[in-house]
Regions:
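Proteins enriched for Cys/Gly/acidic motifs involved in redox and nucleic-acid/cofactor modification
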Residues: 1-198, 242, 248, 252
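Conserved SAM/AdoMet-binding glycine-rich loop
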Residues: 60-64, 69, 181-264
């Protein structure tokens, strides 16, 4: 999911006129973080040290789960950091970088969880409002929800990604069609717990199994996958989709840290 977020930010920056450059030549540096890896905070601070050594004049932004945890402390410890964004700070990041380049003293933080899914569809359009002419891609990843309400003892996700929020069905389908039109025959639907898609207050009445049906109906789409699926919320109807939809690959990704009750 973080990789997908980072790729989206890169595309959105390119659509605003940015060009990818080596670290030493960059005007802005975007660091997206993950808090479920070993020693995540130390790795972020190490990365910031390397950036400062290589390019002390660059505008640096830090986003993702570690940014959500540490917050404004990142700016205090590293003055070069001028943007901090949590899970809901990804969407405003591209426009924030444009502002930061034009306002040298400005610092921005987006650490509050928004009251709706932070949709990014407008960034798939060019300046004329037409679909952006991105390159052909055989595989695509589409966010359908984010956050989690399960609060498992071993998991930090509810604190770093916030409460669960479903994206609108139409928005999901529009992005899937966008990628299929650009050559994607294989789409993975992303979320911290895709099984509860549509069941929160942001849902529009479409369940996850029904969403799978609608995505599978898109002409040209050959394979569908999804991650992650919490076993507590896995319904029989979702299981039945593996038999009903030939496009749905026989693959499950479950957020299991251990099979031992005593260990958990």
């Amino acid at each position: 999911m973080n990789v997908n977020d980072s790729q989206w930010v890169a595309r959105a920056l390119e659509q605003r006129g940015f060009v990818e450059k080596p670290l030493e030549e960059a005007d802005v540096v975007f660091i997206n973080t993950c808090s479920v890896r070993e020693k995540p905070e130390q790795k972020v601070y190490s990365a910031l040290g390397r950036v400062h050594q290589a390019n002390p004049r660059a505008v640096v932004g830090v986003a993702g789960c570690v940014a959500q945890q540490i917050g404004a402390e990142l700016m205090r410890r590293h003055p070069q950091v001028r943007f901090v964004g949590g899970a809901d700070g990804i969407a405003p990041a591209p426009d924030a970088f444009v502002r930061l380049l034009h306002e040298p003293k400005l610092r921005l933080s987006y650490l509050d969880f928004t009251d709706s899914f932070p949709d990014r569809d407008p960034y798939l359009l060019d300046a004329a409002g037409q679909p952006a002419q991105e390159g052909v891609t055989p595989v695509a990843y589409v966010n359908i929800m984010q956050g989690c309400d399960n609060f498992c003892a071993y998991c930090i996700v509810p604190f770093t990604r916030g409460p669960r929020k479903s994206r609108s069905t139409q928005s999901v389908l529009d992005e899937c069609r966008h990628w299929v039109a650009r050559g994607a025959g294989d789409i993975t639907l992303l979320g911290q717990n895709v099984n509860v898609f549509g069941k929160d207050k942001y849902g529009d009445g479409t369940s996850f199994p029904e969403l799978l049906r609608q995505v599978a109906a898109i002409p040209g789409l050959r394979r569908i996958r999804f991650v992650s699926a919490h076993p507590r919320d896995f319904s029989q109807e979702t299981i039945d989709m593996f038999a009903e939809l030939p496009q749905l690959m026989p693959r499950l990704h479950l957020p299991l840290q251990s099979g031992s009750d005593s260990m958990l």
